[in-house]
Amino acid sequence: MDGNRGIPAHSRSLFDPPEQESDRREQGSGPVKTLFAHIDGGARGNPGPAGYGVHLVDDKGNLVAEISRYLGHRTNNFAEYSALIAALEYAMQHGWNGLRVISDSELLVKQIRGEYKVKSPDLKELYDRAMILIRKLAPFSIQHVLREKNRDADRLANWAMDNPALCGAGYIHDRK
């Protein structure tokens, strides 16, 4: 463990085998409930006023929830990682055991897949946190899409940046 941050000192790729088999959902432990998360983060000025949006749908395309959060003065990459963590936490807290993430951040997608190294200390801490959560979900996937294919999440991220007083602690519109 890194004594300064309380996070693992080494990084693991999504494609590395889990440290313990119990980290992943056990085979035959019930039906897979997969949530689809369109995520986006942004910062005006980069760094600057930042926020993220998460648009969550079920496997039939029905809206499950939308999340927006204002993050204060941050970078766009910090906001992208924060959106991913919000999607992971929502899935786990609401009984979904699988997650498919769609993002327009090539950097985030390639870092989570292990194709790029995480060099920024701020992002490394978020990356490690995301990887701990990812190992608890099966199936998990992440894919890159063009910005035009991620409009709902972009709208929510911009709404967070436009409404910091409403989204400072996070805003969740849950369809349950």
Give a label for each model feature:
Residues 1-27, 31, 163-165, 172-176:
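N-terminal intrinsically disordered, compositionally biased regulatory/targeting segments
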Residues 12, 28-78, 89-97:
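RNase H-like nuclease fold core
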Residues 16, 63, 67-69, 113, ...:
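RNase H-like, Mg2+-dependent phosphodiesterase core
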Residues 42-46, 85-158, 165-167:
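RNase H catalytic domain
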Residues 56, 125, 169-174:
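Compositionally biased, low-complexity linear motifs
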Residues 66-71, 86-87, 130-134, 171-176:
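Short C-terminal domain-edge/linker segments immediately following a structured domain
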Residues 73-78, 82, 118-121:
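Residues at secondary-structure transition points
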